[in-house]
Amino acid sequence: MPISLNPSHSNTQTFKVAAVQAEPVWLDLQGGVEKTIRIINEAAAEGAKIIGFPEVFIPGYPWTPWANNFVDAQVVLKKYQANSMPLHSPEMDRIREAVKEADVNIVLGFSERDGSSLYIAQVTITSDGKIANHRRKIKPTHYEKTIFGDGSAQSIYNVVQTPYGRLGSLNCWEHIQPWLKTHFYSQYPQIFVGGWWPAFPPHTGGSPYIVSGEASSRMSQLVSMEGGLFGIVCCHVVSEAGARKMRMLGFPWFTFPGGGFSVIYGPDGAALTDPVDPGKEVVLYANISLDKIDDVKLVADIMGNYSRFDLFHTTVVNGKNWKPVAYGDPDEQAASKAQQAEIDNAGKGSIVPSKL
């Protein structure tokens, strides 16, 4: 289907975007709302039109169950639950009003409380103060599953129109979910906010490289290059006092203060901001214009000139299909099933029954 974007990739208007690197007000809903509003006003005063916040900035990212057994973590997690924010709440209304008064657009990461359950959520709030998009991380990562539920199917719709372009959102390791990303790119985002946890230098305390700040930043950089869009990468800072409150002290993967790796990427993957101290609270700014997207997509547009949808495409099946691959041609599908059956049965005739 032909696509007409407004504003288009020929638009040379320059505007400012902002990436937040800040320490949450740990386990404090009201304090977190106050700090979020302060940052919105600060960034608006600097001329930012789009502001990105980290993953679950309210009330902070809970590394706690990674660093403790569940019994020891529970006292923190109870407070975490109590200070998570419902979507429809006076606290969210205050943030929406602040966005409207500041005349900005934001993507905010927060721990959403729905009844007694928690979800890793993002809202895109446009300059009229309306929630243009609400989504939940589709699959919590590793120990996150002990706290947070899965996002619902509507969470794959994560791109909205703003006066400054089509604005998308991803949370943490959603950046390495291939099928989610394909659906994301199919919505033609021009700018996205990557909301991230606090992450630390590679191999700190024997940690796997994939959980490092460097790896996390590269995941967002790949989305910018792959999709040909601007990336606003936002993450936490953790002080020693914050680590003590969240029971993170003593776990070998962490160094305090630290956790930050915020950056803004261009659609070619180039960093538009200078590296910053991982332990420093800062709001990063970059002036961007959408015409730079065409410079990249002239070479490789994965939703256009650099695609083969006649060979590979993603089918959204509303949770009814568990298979990672399906063939449109019935003969190919039958051949695939026969091949899988052969694999499943391989070696069965050579198994020697036990004599025990």
From Swiss-Prot:
Reactions catalysed: formamide = hydrogen cyanide + H2O
Family membership noted in the UniProt record: Belongs to the carbon-nitrogen hydrolase superfamily. Nitrilase family.
Domain of life: Eukaryota
SUPFAM superfamilies per the UniProt record, alphabetical: Carbon-nitrogen hydrolase
Origin species: Armillaria gallica
PANTHER family: ARYLACETONITRILASE, NITRILASE
InterPro entries reported in the protein's UniProt record: C-N_Hydrolase, C-N_Hydrolase_sf, Nitrilase/CN_hydratase_CS, Nitrilases_CHs
Protein's UniProt name: Cyanide hydratase
Molecular function as annotated in GO: cyanide hydratase activity; nitrilase activity
